[in-house]
From Swiss-Prot:
Main location: host cell
Signal peptide: none
Transmembrane segments: 12-32, 45-65, 75-95, 103-123, 132-152, 154-174, 220-240, 246-266, 271-289, 296-318, 330-350
Lineage of the organism: Viruses, Duplodnaviria, Heunggongvirae, Peploviricota, Herviviricetes
InterPro entries hit by this protein: Herpes_BMRF2 (IPR006727)
Superkingdom of this protein's organism: Viruses
UniProt entry keywords in alphabetical sequence: Host membrane, Membrane, Transmembrane, Transmembrane helix
Name this protein carries in UniProt: Gene 58 protein
Family: Belongs to the herpesviridae BMRF2 family.
GO CC entries: host cell membrane; membrane
Membrane-protein topology: Multi-pass membrane protein
Subcellular location: Host membrane
Length: 359
């Protein structure tokens, strides 16, 4: 049955709202770093922000290897309520200027653990739907992060108003997730993945992780080569140029790059080649040019090309794994591994730069 225009519109809006929910853990890190940097010792905040965000992505990887859908679905409302309560707890610490070195880091860390649930849950739901919904998920993800970035850029960094959009995105995102799971296109996607021989523990076709290389081995190799290549370039740029001075600005983007590419990730190896070759042509300019602003723009452009190349490959992976109910989880695990590798390289590079300045 072909979905009507109204059905597609509802799925589009639901995917957009679900994308805002998926960005919750990254926005939480961004808010904490921006709002409380002046309240807590700078070193302590940096350590918590840098390494805490990496740990939460490792936790998301754990979710990719677990059957959690049925269990978590019963407690999503409770998890959202816990997130809101923790948010108000941090708001009280900010308002009354207390617990900056005790309660605040604890609240931040505990809430970050609970927020880590949302990206795996939303990613799996949306990426089981038709491809057009994926682009709107990415748009919602980008909107949630951009709204908070703009509020911080054009307003006071100490205002508690910044927590209001975050709470709204949580509530609206959870509602959107509920709506999305009621759509016929989502239900059809679930039915298409039902196993031929159904047992109690095997309702759907599941791709075993041991056979993944036979399905997407080439794509995994291409992604690995691109990731290593970009990490080497980033390290060289940090060592031999002064672009490292502004690398901290890119940190948030590096953490969610593979989840937000503006819909430019096409399922084509030719597109991957074009992105990679363009990036390779631009890389030497970062070492040759003198103007820091131009080099920073080029660095961001190369990162954008790298991420789109990776997304082309993950889109191909998703197409090859479309028969498995856990196909989106496998793709999510690849995206997380890329993010973790790049963010870890950036963090280490920036820490070395900070230590060098202290000497």
């Amino acid at each position: 049955m072909t979905p009507s225009v109204m059905d597609r519109a509802v799925l589009t809006m639901a995917a957009f709202g679900t994308g805002m929910l998926g960005a919750a853990s990254f926005v939480w890190c961004f808010l904490f770093r921006s709002l409380f940097a002046s309240c807590v010792l700078e070193r302590a905040v940096d350590e918590l922000f840098f390494w805490g965000s990496l740990c939460v992505q490792v936790m998301m990887l754990f979710f990719c290897f677990r059957k959690y859908s049925k269990t978590l679905s019963r407690y999503l409302d409770l998890i959202c309520a816990v997130n809101i309560v923790a948010l108000f707890g941090c708001l009280i610490c900010l308002q009354y200027k207390m617990g900056f070195r005790t309660y605040l880091p604890i609240l931040f860390s505990l809430n970050l653990i609970w927020l880590s649930v949302w990206l795996p849950v939303t990613f799996e739901a949306v990426y089981l739907c038709p491809p057009y919904a994926n682009a709107y998920f990415q748009l919602g993800f980008f909107t949630a992060t951009t709204v908070h970035y703009l509020l911080l850029s054009f307003g006071s960094v100490t205002t508690s108003f910044l927590f209001i959009p975050f709470a709204c995105f949580l509530i609206a995102g959870l509602y959107s997730l509920r709506v999305l799971k009621k759509q016929e296109e989502f239900k059809s996607a679930i039915l298409d993945r039902r196993a031929i021989f159904i047992t109690r523990d095997n309702l759907y076709v599941t791709i075993n992780f041991s056979v993944i290389p036979s399905f997407i081995g080439m794509e995994l190799c291409v992604v690995a080569v691109m990731t290593v290549g970009f990490a080497v370039f980033m390290t060289a740029a940090g060592v031999y140029t002064d672009v490292v001075k502004v690398l901290k600005t890119y940190l948030l983007m590096f953490q969610f790059g593979t989840f937000c590419v503006g819909g430019m990730g096409y399922p084509s190896r030719k597109a991957t080649f074009v992105y990679c070759m363009t990036a390779c042509i631009l890389m030497p300019l970062v070492f040759v040019l003198q103007d820091l602003t131009i080099k920073s723009v080029l660095f961001l452009a190369i990162f954008f090309l790298f991420i789109n190349g990776v997304t082309c490959e993950t889109t191909i992976m998703l197409a090859k794994l479309k028969k498995g109910i856990n196909g989106p989880k496998i793709v999510l695990s690849v995206c997380l591994l890329v993010n973790i590798c790049i963010t870890l390289s950036l963090n280490v590079l920036y820490k070395v730069y900070i230590e060098t300045l202290k000497k």
